[in-house]
């Protein structure tokens, strides 16, 4: 019987998850089924769709926007990183029938940074722009690599203070940042609107990597802005997407996919 997986979302037609997981299955040498499931934007509809899929033998599921908080509530138990994130992007069915809720977003970021881009995070000064769900989901995995410091900056400073307080790290107002960071990560939604965050341009002086968690076929507005103002290297979040998918796949199947080759495939397709 071919194992079945899905991704729940709304919208979901754009999701690259089926393609990514089929690449992973090719690496493992197995057949899987991976579908997209469009769900209406209510808790009842999400719960019904998730319950139906899992009761019918679904071997695992991914969850994308806007359902990560619904997924957290639906899960029977949670990983430490899901608890830290307050959101779930992966369901892992357990042998006892319970559903483990995990969040692989932060691991996806770290895998892209460390395995794919070759960045050493230990001892680095990291700035995280944004204080929403995207930012919260990556803090714990970043801290696990023992950076010298991790600072959260946000347009609404009180939200940065609130998130920083959860993890006992630093917060800073977005417009009062100083040029003292090795790595700057954009977890705001600015690139969705084709704009860079409202930050002082000189913060990129001395920065060797400016990383946008958003991805696109061409350099994002954040990447362009960072490069123009001194960032030595820029990257988008495609590798994070592949990395979080790989972390989920490994939990489901016990097979660790190679992410670099999949990223190359996706880049080549985007360039066609």
Predicted features and spans:
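Helix N-cap at the beta1-alpha1 junction of Rossmann-like dinucleotide-binding domains, i.e.
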Residues: 12-14, 157-158, 217
